[in-house]
């Protein structure tokens, strides 16, 4: 009873999370958005099932289909049947394809496994499902999954796939098998290579009218033998003897969710002969095949891999001004998980880049992780019906603006504070953008070094700064006073690399002010253009004023 109560609570929590992300649309807009996406998915379905081609990645299709279902539930529409092919000339399956229920996480899988025994894990091979019917030892019929009850006659196509045994003996002589036709791969590593649109490629080969030699690039993984031997070990042995060797190789006994997780992680990183999108856990004990119905399999579940790329809704477009004055565009997202990382923002780049992407709030974008786990945009996969894009700020900033605070300088000023606090500059540990905003909002800094005047009491009474952290910050600010002269010059934004600045051997503000353009041009990695920038920088009125202020604070190198 406790187990079922836990499952019920999990379901309710899942439903709550779905409702929590329902769009704030009027009924009219909801109808328009749902209708547009429904039409697009129907077009993709027609291309997939009638033409054997795919205009969209498998993962994007799956996620947009799930998004459509979510919207339909939010606004009381009838959810569509996913991947429903046309049934013209359909053939009845001897045994229905049940499909497989997906587990949301390891905890849900653990609850499901707790009620069952004699469990086995298999890879969830990514291809197209098929029924193989053997009569009197020969392949009699091959049927596509279709809607689970009826499918297309694929006998001629399957008979040309060399990986599918055309004759069998013993218990398999009169049998019905269910499995996955897949694209054969050599050393496919799912973690690195992803799905490669394998499902669509297989469907394309199976739907073509010509009997191409390319069918030999396909294989089959049998995952069910309805009314077969009771013992899983016997099933696997007979299948392997008949030529279905992959089933025995990739079926393992498991006792709990931890063991499943280990196998799942192993197959995620291992070289496999097929593309996978997760694992399937099944009980050896199955009901008689006459009781099998689509959507009603209680003896098996799937635990899919998290997609390498996720479809995320754009909630807002925001503009940021960097320390150099360049305007960058950031998309605020409905949260998605990527490799155990919660992603809520992604950098689009420059205003021009944003305009080229043509991204607006309400659009659906494909997001993945680039090097060092940084989110990136891979594609815009769906644009909303109503698209209102914000106006970017005027491009009035440059590398010599906003050393002093003003209303128009807010963003660049904060960016300068974040920069000077970085490890490679003044090394102010424990404060980031949010902390700087809190300090500036409360104490209204005059310029980028005004924080040097804050007292312990002021820091302690700053909203947004924990009292336990205020003493640490005051200590960090005091330590900064002892940083080398070159660090302070870097904090002021001198347009030189750290290596060039160190090579200059400048150790005082007065010495730096009297250095010529020719002197700077001789430094490593510093050409004439960069040297002119240094001259413009040191002659700027704001820079001179900051230098004088630091001298008054007796910062090393700035004293008269």
Swiss-Prot record:
Question: In the UniProt record, does the keyword NAD occur?
Answer: yes
Give the catalytic activity: NAD(+) + (deoxyribonucleotide)n-3'-hydroxyl + 5'-phospho-(deoxyribonucleotide)m = (deoxyribonucleotide)n+m + AMP + beta-nicotinamide D-nucleotide
Please indicate which superkingdom the organism of origin belongs to. Answer: Bacteria
The record's Pfam families line, in alphabetical order, gives:
DNA_ligase_aden, DNA_ligase_OB
* Keywords assigned: DNA damage, DNA repair, DNA replication, Ligase, NAD
Q: Where are the transmembrane segments?
A: none
Q: Tell me which SMART domains the record gives.
A: LIGANc (SM00532)
Could you confirm whether the keyword Transferase appears in this record?
no
Q: Which PROSITE patterns match?
A: DNA_LIGASE_N1, DNA_LIGASE_N2
Q: Which GO terms describe its biological process?
A: DNA repair; DNA replication
Major enzyme class? ligase
Q: Name one GO molecular function term.
A: DNA ligase (NAD+) activity
The EC designation for this entry is 6.5.1.2
Q: Which residues form the active site?
A: 124
**Entries under NCBIfam families matching the protein:** PRK08097.1
Function summary: Catalyzes the formation of phosphodiester linkages between 5'-phosphoryl and 3'-hydroxyl groups in double-stranded DNA using NAD as a coenzyme and as the energy source for the reaction.
- Can you tell me which family this protein belongs to? Belongs to the NAD-dependent DNA ligase family. LigB subfamily.
* Name of the protein in its database record: DNA ligase B
Ranked from the top, the taxonomy reads: Bacteria, Pseudomonadati, Pseudomonadota, Gammaproteobacteria, Enterobacterales
């Amino acid at each position: 009873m406790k187990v079922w109560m836990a499952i019920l609570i999990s379901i309710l929590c899942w439903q709550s999370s779905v409702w929590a992300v329902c769009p704030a649309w009027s009924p009219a807009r909801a109808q328009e958005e749902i209708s547009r996406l429904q039409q697009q998915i129907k077009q993709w379905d027609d291309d997939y099932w009638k033409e054997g081609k795919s205009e969209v990645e498998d993962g994007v299709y799956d996620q947009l289909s799930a998004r459509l279902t979510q919207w339909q539930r939010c606004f009381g529409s009838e959810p569509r049947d996913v991947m429903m092919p046309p049934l013209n000339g359909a053939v009845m399956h001897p045994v229905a394809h049940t499909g497989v229920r997906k587990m949301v996480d390891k905890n849900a899988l653990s609850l499901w496994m707790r009620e069952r025994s004699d469990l086995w894990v298999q890879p969830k091979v990514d291809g197209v499902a098929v029924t193989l019917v053997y009569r009197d030892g020969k392949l009699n019929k091959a049927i596509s999954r279709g809607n689970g009850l009826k499918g297309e006659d694929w006998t001629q196509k399957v008979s040309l796939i060399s990986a599918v045994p055309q004759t069998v003996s013993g218990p398999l002589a009169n049998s019905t098998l269910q499995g996955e036709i897949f694209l054969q791969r050599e050393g496919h590593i799912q973690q690195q290579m992803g799905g490669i649109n394998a499902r669509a490629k297989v469907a394309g080969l199976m739907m073509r009218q010509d009997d191409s030699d390319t069918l030999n690039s396909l294989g089959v993984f049998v995952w069910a033998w309805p009314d077969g031997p009771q013992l899983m070990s016997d099933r696997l042995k007979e299948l392997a003897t008949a030529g279905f060797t992959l089933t025995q190789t990739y079926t393992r006994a498991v006792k709990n969710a931890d063991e499943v997780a280990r196998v799942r992680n192993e197959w995620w990183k291992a070289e496999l002969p097929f593309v996978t999108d997760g694992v399937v856990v099944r009980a050896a004990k199955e009901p008689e095949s006459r009781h099998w119905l689509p959507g009603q399999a209680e003896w098996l579940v799937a635990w899919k891999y998290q997609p390498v790329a996720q479809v995320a809704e754009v909630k807002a477009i925001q503009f940021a001004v960097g320390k150099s004055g360049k305007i960058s565009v950031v998309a605020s997202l409905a949260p998605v998980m990527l490799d155990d990382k919660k992603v809520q923002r992604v950098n689009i780049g420059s205003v021009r880049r944003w305009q080229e992407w043509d991204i607006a709030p309400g659009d659906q974008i494909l997001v993945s992780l680039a090097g060092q786990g940084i989110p990136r945009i891979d594609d815009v996969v769906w644009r909303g019906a109503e698209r209102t894009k914000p106006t970017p700020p005027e491009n009035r900033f440059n590398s010599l603006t906003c050393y002093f605070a003003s209303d128009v300088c807010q963003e660049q000023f904060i960016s300068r504070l974040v920069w000077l606090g970085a490890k490679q500059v003044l090394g102010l540990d424990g404060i980031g953008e949010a902390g700087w905003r809190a300090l500036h909002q409360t104490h209204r800094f005059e310029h980028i070094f005004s924080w040097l005047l804050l007292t312990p009491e002021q820091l302690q009474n700053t909203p947004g700064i924990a009292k336990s952290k205020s003493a640490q910050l005051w200590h960090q600010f005091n330590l900064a006073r002892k940083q080398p002269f070159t660090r302070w010059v870097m904090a002021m934004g001198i347009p030189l690399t750290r290596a060039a600045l160190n090579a200059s051997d400048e150790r005082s503000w007065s010495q730096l002010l009297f250095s010529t353009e020719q002197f700077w041009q001789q430094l490593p990695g510093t050409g004439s253009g960069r040297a002119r920038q240094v001259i413009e920088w040191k002659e700027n009125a704001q820079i001179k004023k900051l230098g004088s202020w630091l001298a008054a604070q007796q910062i090393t190198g700035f004293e008269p």
